[in-house]
Amino acid sequence: MITLQVDLGERSYPIHIGTGLLGNAELLRPHVRGQHAVIVTNETVGPLYAARVEASLKELGKTVRVVTLPDGEAFKQWETLNLIFDALLSAGADRKTTLVALGGGVVGDMTGFAAACYMRGVPFVQVPTTLLSQVDSSVGGKTGINHPLGKNMIGAFHQPNAVIADIDTLRTLPARELAAGMAEVIKHGAIADADYFAWIERNIAALNSCDPDLMALAVQRSCEIKAGVVAQDEREGGLRAILNFGHTFGHAIEAGMGYGEWLHGEAVGCGMVMAADLSHRLGFIDTETRARIRQLTQAAMLPIVAPELGTDRYIELMKVDKKAEAGSIKFILLKKLGEAFITTVPDTDLRATLAQAVLKPPTEATVA
């Protein structure tokens, strides 16, 4: 087992990465201090892993309740969130009750938001079961739900007590979900570590096959990068925005297509290709770097051609973005591989990238 630390002073917490962790009650002991625990999971993950986590909590003498949510991005909304609140209230949960988020990014985001809101804040533990949530969304304290007009527009910063990433859970991931997680892995290399990006290029075939040793290394390095950024800028006042590389375009794709049509990682992957093209148009990265990002994204079985929403519709959707200021869209672009920055861009270049993004190159194919 590998343990990393998210250094946030009194709110610091560990990230445990390894195999066989769901059945390790001692990992939970320091982080579930009250008598009651509520596991929040979904219809897919619950039947696979909830009993194991429940047994660990009961081994610690805790009273445990399991809340099972519908599965999918389309359910990341108020009505689903209220299912968590209903369960907490009916169980008489108090401020020492610990919530345990057992699932992917949707479960983690909603459980964290419920923990931030219930009685103005109760503790929670992240137990991510998808690659995307293990390398990205479980770390950093961003919680929230979607609104029909924009992704993650309603939420709060609420740090978990711990993150427990059991690599064994990745074995049950469908190929599409695994690919979606690879988008965030690639992102971390692109924005912060060119050597890591090159390592992903060399090992992409084995990563696509979910090689456990390589997956553990990818989760570790991605968490190191994200934890380092979060420690410097917890509430996205500046540096943390670089973690949104590909997300301005990606969130527009998700909202424009309807939440759940594209997985978040699929939209981010395509968004990174678009952001790389825009970085190239503005003279920051060379043709080779743009091609490497596109080729690695495609090799990870992610879409590289954007849906045809219309240029004006894309721009309209991107204006509903947390980074936008006074209607001005901000993008995370690359100065070079391994170094990102936030900026506004000329309208003509943005429109050129959007026009190019929907075109299928004759030598490449869109990955469904």
Curated annotation (Swiss-Prot):
It is found in: Cytoplasm. Gene3D superfamilies: 3.40.50.1970, Dehydroquinate synthase-like - alpha domain. NAD(+) binds at residues 71-76, 105-109, 129-130, 142, 151, 169-172. Zn(2+) binds at E184, H247, H264. InterPro entries: Dehydroquinate_synthase (IPR050071), DHQ_synth_AroB (IPR016037), DHQ_synth_fam (IPR030963), DHQS/DOIS_N (IPR030960), DHQS_C (IPR056179). It is an enzyme of class 4 (lyase). It catalyses: 7-phospho-2-dehydro-3-deoxy-D-arabino-heptonate = 3-dehydroquinate + phosphate. Its main location: cytoplasm. GO terms for cellular component: cytoplasm. Binds 1 divalent metal cation per subunit. Can use either Co(2+) or Zn(2+). Keywords: Amino-acid biosynthesis, Aromatic amino acid biosynthesis, Cobalt, Cytoplasm, Lyase, Metal-binding, NAD, Nucleotide-binding, Zinc. GO terms for biological process: amino acid biosynthetic process; aromatic amino acid family biosynthetic process; chorismate biosynthetic process. Its cofactor is Co(2+); Zn(2+); NAD(+). Its EC number is 4.2.3.4. Catalyzes the conversion of 3-deoxy-D-arabino-heptulosonate 7-phosphate (DAHP) to dehydroquinate (DHQ). This is 3-dehydroquinate synthase. It comes from Cupriavidus pinatubonensis (strain JMP 134 / LMG 1197) (Cupriavidus necator (strain JMP 134)).
